[in-house]
Amino acid sequence: MTNHLECVTAQKSQWYWYLLVIFICFMATNTVGAIPLFIILITQWIQNPKPLTDINSFSQESMMSGIDSNLYLASMAFSFVVFLAVAIWIIKMFHGRSWTEVINGTKRVRWSRFFVGLAVWGVLQVGSFAINYMTDPNNFEFRFEPVRFIFLTIITLTMIPIQSSCEEFVFRGYLAQGVASWTGSRLWTLLIPSVLFALLHSANPEVTKYGFGVMMANYFLIGLTFGLISLLDDGIELAMGAHSINNILGSMLMTYEGSALRTDALFKAKIINPGEDLFIAVISSIVFIGILAFIYKWKFGILTRRVSPPSPVLS
Protein backbone atom coordinates (compact mmCIF):
# COMPACT_ATOMS: atom_id res chain seq x y z
CA MET A 1 0.00 0.00 0.00
CA THR A 2 1.17 3.51 -0.83
CA ASN A 3 0.21 6.61 1.11
CA HIS A 4 -0.49 9.29 -1.47
CA LEU A 5 -3.13 7.73 -3.72
CA GLU A 6 -4.63 5.39 -1.15
CA CYS A 7 -5.34 7.85 1.64
CA VAL A 8 -8.63 8.71 -0.09
CA THR A 9 -11.79 7.78 1.78
CA ALA A 10 -15.32 7.31 0.44
CA GLN A 11 -16.30 10.72 1.82
CA LYS A 12 -17.69 12.63 -1.17
CA SER A 13 -15.41 10.67 -3.49
CA GLN A 14 -17.62 10.90 -6.61
CA TRP A 15 -16.28 12.85 -9.59
CA TYR A 16 -18.85 15.65 -9.33
CA TRP A 17 -17.57 16.63 -5.88
CA TYR A 18 -14.12 17.15 -7.37
CA LEU A 19 -15.63 19.23 -10.15
CA LEU A 20 -17.47 21.32 -7.57
CA VAL A 21 -14.29 21.90 -5.58
CA ILE A 22 -12.42 23.10 -8.68
CA PHE A 23 -15.36 25.32 -9.65
CA ILE A 24 -15.50 26.96 -6.21
CA CYS A 25 -11.75 27.55 -6.28
CA PHE A 26 -11.91 29.13 -9.74
CA MET A 27 -14.78 31.37 -8.65
CA ALA A 28 -12.80 32.54 -5.62
CA THR A 29 -9.73 33.10 -7.78
CA ASN A 30 -11.64 35.19 -10.32
CA THR A 31 -13.32 37.32 -7.64
CA VAL A 32 -11.23 37.73 -4.49
CA GLY A 33 -8.04 36.67 -6.26
CA ALA A 34 -8.59 39.18 -9.05
CA ILE A 35 -8.97 42.21 -6.76
CA PRO A 36 -5.31 43.39 -7.01
CA LEU A 37 -5.33 43.13 -10.81
CA PHE A 38 -8.71 44.86 -10.96
CA ILE A 39 -7.36 47.76 -8.88
CA ILE A 40 -4.32 48.02 -11.16
CA LEU A 41 -6.51 48.04 -14.28
CA ILE A 42 -8.86 50.67 -12.84
CA THR A 43 -5.90 52.86 -11.85
CA GLN A 44 -4.45 52.48 -15.33
CA TRP A 45 -7.78 53.35 -16.94
CA ILE A 46 -8.14 56.48 -14.75
CA GLN A 47 -4.67 57.61 -15.79
CA ASN A 48 -5.29 56.81 -19.44
CA PRO A 49 -9.07 56.59 -20.05
CA LYS A 50 -10.34 54.82 -23.15
CA PRO A 51 -13.85 55.14 -24.57
CA LEU A 52 -16.19 52.30 -23.61
CA THR A 53 -17.17 51.98 -27.26
CA ASP A 54 -13.62 51.01 -28.20
CA ILE A 55 -13.88 47.23 -27.94
CA ASN A 56 -10.25 46.74 -28.91
CA SER A 57 -9.14 48.75 -25.90
CA PHE A 58 -10.41 45.94 -23.69
CA SER A 59 -8.35 43.18 -25.29
CA GLN A 60 -5.99 41.38 -22.93
CA GLU A 61 -2.94 42.58 -24.85
CA SER A 62 -4.09 46.19 -24.66
CA MET A 63 -4.97 46.06 -20.97
CA MET A 64 -1.66 44.50 -19.97
CA SER A 65 0.52 46.72 -22.14
CA GLY A 66 0.55 49.62 -19.70
CA ILE A 67 0.93 47.62 -16.49
CA ASP A 68 4.25 47.43 -14.69
CA SER A 69 5.55 43.89 -15.19
CA ASN A 70 6.41 43.44 -11.50
CA LEU A 71 2.94 44.54 -10.42
CA TYR A 72 1.34 42.23 -12.95
CA LEU A 73 3.46 39.29 -11.78
CA ALA A 74 2.54 39.93 -8.14
CA SER A 75 -1.17 40.27 -8.92
CA MET A 76 -1.14 37.12 -11.03
CA ALA A 77 0.64 35.14 -8.31
CA PHE A 78 -1.77 36.45 -5.67
CA SER A 79 -4.67 34.77 -7.45
CA PHE A 80 -2.92 31.42 -6.94
CA VAL A 81 -2.51 32.17 -3.24
CA VAL A 82 -6.29 32.56 -3.04
CA PHE A 83 -6.88 29.41 -5.10
CA LEU A 84 -4.59 27.35 -2.87
CA ALA A 85 -6.06 28.68 0.38
CA VAL A 86 -9.62 27.98 -0.75
CA ALA A 87 -8.64 24.55 -2.10
CA ILE A 88 -7.08 23.53 1.22
CA TRP A 89 -10.20 24.64 3.12
CA ILE A 90 -12.75 23.09 0.73
CA ILE A 91 -10.91 19.77 0.38
CA LYS A 92 -10.74 19.44 4.15
CA MET A 93 -14.43 20.29 4.48
CA PHE A 94 -15.66 18.04 1.65
CA HIS A 95 -13.26 15.09 1.76
CA GLY A 96 -11.75 15.27 5.23
CA ARG A 97 -8.21 15.34 3.80
CA SER A 98 -5.59 17.71 5.15
CA TRP A 99 -3.29 19.65 2.83
CA THR A 100 -0.38 17.38 3.76
CA GLU A 101 -2.45 14.31 2.83
CA VAL A 102 -3.07 15.81 -0.61
CA ILE A 103 0.69 16.24 -0.95
CA ASN A 104 1.79 12.76 0.13
CA GLY A 105 -0.96 11.01 2.08
CA THR A 106 0.67 11.58 5.47
CA LYS A 107 0.75 14.30 8.10
CA ARG A 108 4.23 15.60 7.23
CA VAL A 109 5.71 17.23 4.13
CA ARG A 110 9.08 15.85 3.01
CA TRP A 111 10.73 19.21 2.46
CA SER A 112 14.10 17.66 1.64
CA ARG A 113 12.52 16.18 -1.49
CA PHE A 114 11.16 19.59 -2.47
CA PHE A 115 14.69 20.99 -2.48
CA VAL A 116 16.14 17.96 -4.26
CA GLY A 117 13.60 18.38 -7.07
CA LEU A 118 14.36 22.10 -7.17
CA ALA A 119 18.13 21.54 -7.29
CA VAL A 120 18.22 18.75 -9.89
CA TRP A 121 15.73 20.37 -12.29
CA GLY A 122 17.36 23.77 -11.72
CA VAL A 123 20.82 22.47 -12.67
CA LEU A 124 19.41 20.87 -15.82
CA GLN A 125 17.59 24.05 -16.86
CA VAL A 126 20.53 26.36 -16.14
CA GLY A 127 22.81 23.95 -17.99
CA SER A 128 20.47 23.95 -20.98
CA PHE A 129 20.39 27.75 -20.98
CA ALA A 130 24.19 27.94 -20.73
CA ILE A 131 24.61 25.66 -23.76
CA ASN A 132 22.12 27.74 -25.78
CA TYR A 133 23.86 30.95 -24.78
CA MET A 134 27.36 29.69 -25.62
CA THR A 135 26.30 28.31 -29.00
CA ASP A 136 24.35 31.43 -30.03
CA PRO A 137 25.09 34.43 -27.77
CA ASN A 138 23.70 36.89 -30.32
CA ASN A 139 20.22 35.46 -29.78
CA PHE A 140 20.16 36.80 -26.23
CA GLU A 141 19.76 40.36 -25.05
CA PHE A 142 21.20 41.03 -21.60
CA ARG A 143 19.09 43.41 -19.52
CA PHE A 144 19.82 44.43 -15.96
CA GLU A 145 18.02 47.20 -14.11
CA PRO A 146 19.16 46.84 -10.48
CA VAL A 147 16.14 48.34 -8.70
CA ARG A 148 13.55 46.58 -10.85
CA PHE A 149 15.45 43.30 -10.65
CA ILE A 150 15.57 43.48 -6.85
CA PHE A 151 11.78 43.85 -6.73
CA LEU A 152 11.42 41.08 -9.31
CA THR A 153 13.60 38.81 -7.17
CA ILE A 154 11.53 39.47 -4.04
CA ILE A 155 8.23 38.84 -5.83
CA THR A 156 9.53 35.77 -7.64
CA LEU A 157 11.11 34.04 -4.65
CA THR A 158 8.15 34.68 -2.34
CA MET A 159 5.20 34.08 -4.66
CA ILE A 160 6.23 31.92 -7.62
CA PRO A 161 6.83 28.82 -5.45
CA ILE A 162 3.26 29.22 -4.16
CA GLN A 163 1.91 29.55 -7.71
CA SER A 164 3.85 26.52 -8.93
CA SER A 165 3.05 24.41 -5.88
CA CYS A 166 -0.62 25.31 -6.26
CA GLU A 167 -0.67 23.74 -9.73
CA GLU A 168 1.06 20.63 -8.41
CA PHE A 169 -1.32 20.48 -5.45
CA VAL A 170 -4.30 20.51 -7.82
CA PHE A 171 -3.09 18.27 -10.66
CA ARG A 172 -0.52 15.83 -9.24
CA GLY A 173 -2.12 15.95 -5.79
CA TYR A 174 -5.88 16.40 -5.60
CA LEU A 175 -6.97 15.37 -9.10
CA ALA A 176 -4.52 12.47 -9.19
CA GLN A 177 -6.06 11.14 -5.97
CA GLY A 178 -9.51 11.51 -7.49
CA VAL A 179 -8.63 9.73 -10.74
CA ALA A 180 -6.91 6.94 -8.80
CA SER A 181 -9.99 6.41 -6.63
CA TRP A 182 -12.30 6.26 -9.67
CA THR A 183 -10.19 4.09 -11.97
CA GLY A 184 -7.88 2.17 -9.65
CA SER A 185 -5.19 2.65 -12.31
CA ARG A 186 -1.90 4.46 -11.87
CA LEU A 187 -1.52 4.82 -15.63
CA TRP A 188 -4.81 6.71 -15.92
CA THR A 189 -3.73 8.68 -12.86
CA LEU A 190 -0.64 9.69 -14.82
CA LEU A 191 -2.34 10.46 -18.13
CA ILE A 192 -5.58 12.25 -17.23
CA PRO A 193 -4.11 14.99 -14.98
CA SER A 194 -1.30 15.49 -17.53
CA VAL A 195 -3.83 16.11 -20.32
CA LEU A 196 -5.85 18.47 -18.10
CA PHE A 197 -2.65 20.27 -17.10
CA ALA A 198 -1.79 20.85 -20.76
CA LEU A 199 -5.31 22.03 -21.60
CA LEU A 200 -5.25 24.48 -18.69
CA HIS A 201 -2.29 26.19 -20.35
CA SER A 202 -3.89 26.29 -23.80
CA ALA A 203 -4.88 29.94 -23.27
CA ASN A 204 -1.28 30.99 -22.62
CA PRO A 205 0.16 33.51 -25.11
CA GLU A 206 2.90 31.04 -26.13
CA VAL A 207 0.25 28.80 -27.68
CA THR A 208 -1.03 31.56 -29.94
CA LYS A 209 2.45 32.68 -30.95
CA TYR A 210 4.22 29.36 -31.46
CA GLY A 211 1.44 26.92 -32.31
CA PHE A 212 -1.05 24.76 -30.44
CA GLY A 213 0.45 21.37 -31.26
CA VAL A 214 4.05 21.93 -30.24
CA MET A 215 3.19 23.94 -27.14
CA MET A 216 0.60 21.40 -25.98
CA ALA A 217 3.25 18.72 -26.42
CA ASN A 218 5.59 20.77 -24.21
CA TYR A 219 2.99 21.21 -21.48
CA PHE A 220 1.91 17.58 -21.67
CA LEU A 221 5.53 16.45 -21.37
CA ILE A 222 6.03 18.57 -18.26
CA GLY A 223 2.81 17.23 -16.75
CA LEU A 224 3.81 13.67 -17.61
CA THR A 225 7.28 14.08 -16.11
CA PHE A 226 6.04 15.62 -12.88
CA GLY A 227 3.20 13.10 -12.70
CA LEU A 228 5.57 10.16 -13.16
CA ILE A 229 7.97 11.22 -10.42
CA SER A 230 5.01 11.83 -8.11
CA LEU A 231 3.69 8.30 -8.67
CA LEU A 232 7.12 6.74 -8.21
CA ASP A 233 7.91 8.80 -5.11
CA ASP A 234 4.46 8.46 -3.47
CA GLY A 235 4.04 12.23 -3.16
CA ILE A 236 4.36 15.50 -5.03
CA GLU A 237 7.22 17.25 -3.21
CA LEU A 238 9.77 16.58 -5.97
CA ALA A 239 7.35 17.94 -8.57
CA MET A 240 6.62 21.00 -6.41
CA GLY A 241 10.32 21.80 -6.21
CA ALA A 242 10.99 21.21 -9.90
CA HIS A 243 7.97 23.24 -10.99
CA SER A 244 8.98 26.07 -8.66
CA ILE A 245 12.53 26.41 -10.00
CA ASN A 246 11.24 26.04 -13.56
CA ASN A 247 9.03 29.11 -13.14
CA ILE A 248 11.57 31.00 -11.02
CA LEU A 249 14.11 30.72 -13.83
CA GLY A 250 11.43 31.65 -16.36
CA SER A 251 10.79 34.79 -14.35
CA MET A 252 14.32 35.83 -13.43
CA LEU A 253 16.80 34.26 -15.85
CA MET A 254 15.26 34.32 -19.33
CA THR A 255 12.07 35.49 -20.95
CA TYR A 256 10.96 35.78 -24.56
CA GLU A 257 8.32 37.34 -26.75
CA GLY A 258 4.96 35.74 -26.06
CA SER A 259 5.93 34.30 -22.69
CA ALA A 260 3.23 33.98 -20.03
CA LEU A 261 5.81 35.41 -17.60
CA ARG A 262 6.47 38.89 -18.99
CA THR A 263 9.17 40.06 -16.63
CA ASP A 264 12.40 42.04 -16.57
CA ALA A 265 14.46 38.85 -16.60
CA LEU A 266 18.22 39.08 -17.02
CA PHE A 267 18.08 37.74 -20.57
CA LYS A 268 15.54 37.99 -23.36
CA ALA A 269 15.71 35.49 -26.21
CA LYS A 270 15.16 37.09 -29.61
CA ILE A 271 14.16 33.89 -31.42
CA ILE A 272 12.50 30.82 -29.94
CA ASN A 273 12.44 27.43 -31.66
CA PRO A 274 9.67 25.49 -29.90
CA GLY A 275 10.46 22.24 -31.72
CA GLU A 276 14.07 22.37 -30.58
CA ASP A 277 12.95 23.31 -27.08
CA LEU A 278 10.64 20.28 -27.02
CA PHE A 279 13.54 17.98 -27.92
CA ILE A 280 15.69 19.50 -25.17
CA ALA A 281 12.79 19.11 -22.73
CA VAL A 282 12.50 15.41 -23.59
CA ILE A 283 16.21 14.87 -22.91
CA SER A 284 16.07 16.92 -19.70
CA SER A 285 13.05 14.98 -18.48
CA ILE A 286 14.69 11.60 -19.12
CA VAL A 287 17.87 12.67 -17.32
CA PHE A 288 15.82 14.18 -14.48
CA ILE A 289 13.81 11.00 -13.94
CA GLY A 290 16.96 8.89 -14.20
CA ILE A 291 18.82 10.89 -11.55
CA LEU A 292 15.91 10.79 -9.13
CA ALA A 293 15.33 7.08 -9.76
CA PHE A 294 18.98 6.46 -8.88
CA ILE A 295 18.81 8.60 -5.72
CA TYR A 296 15.59 7.09 -4.39
CA LYS A 297 15.91 3.54 -5.79
CA TRP A 298 12.46 3.67 -7.38
CA LYS A 299 10.69 0.52 -8.54
CA PHE A 300 8.93 1.22 -11.85
CA GLY A 301 6.78 -1.88 -11.47
CA ILE A 302 4.55 0.09 -9.10
CA LEU A 303 3.05 1.86 -12.14
CA THR A 304 1.08 -1.26 -13.06
CA ARG A 305 -0.08 -1.99 -9.51
CA ARG A 306 -3.77 -1.36 -8.84
CA VAL A 307 -4.80 1.39 -6.46
CA SER A 308 -6.95 0.23 -3.56
CA PRO A 309 -10.54 1.56 -3.60
CA PRO A 310 -11.44 4.41 -1.22
CA SER A 311 -11.62 3.27 2.38
CA PRO A 312 -14.93 3.53 4.27
CA VAL A 313 -15.61 6.69 6.24
CA LEU A 314 -15.15 6.10 9.95
CA SER A 315 -17.97 7.50 12.03
Regions found by a protein language model. Give the residues of each.
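Residue-level signature of transmembrane alpha-helical entry/exit and packing/kink sites
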Residues: 14-18, 22, 68, 72-76, ...
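C-terminal TM-helix exit segments that contain a strictly Trp-centered aromatic cap at the helix terminus
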Residues: 33-40, 127-132, 249-255
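N-terminal, membrane-interfacial amphipathic/helix-forming hydrophobic leader that caps
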Residues: 1-98, 264-315
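Membrane-helix interfacial "entry" motifs
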Residues: 10, 14, 18, 64-72, ...
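Transmembrane helix-loop-helix hairpins at the membrane interface
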Residues: 153-314
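Hydrophobic alpha-helical transmembrane segments of multi-pass integral membrane proteins
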Residues: 79-90, 118-128, 191-195
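Juxtamembrane helix-loop-helix connectors linking adjacent transmembrane helices
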Residues: 61-68, 74-77, 99-166, 176-177, ...
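Hydrophobic/aromatic residues in alpha-helical transmembrane segments
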Residues: 32, 86, 127, 175, ...
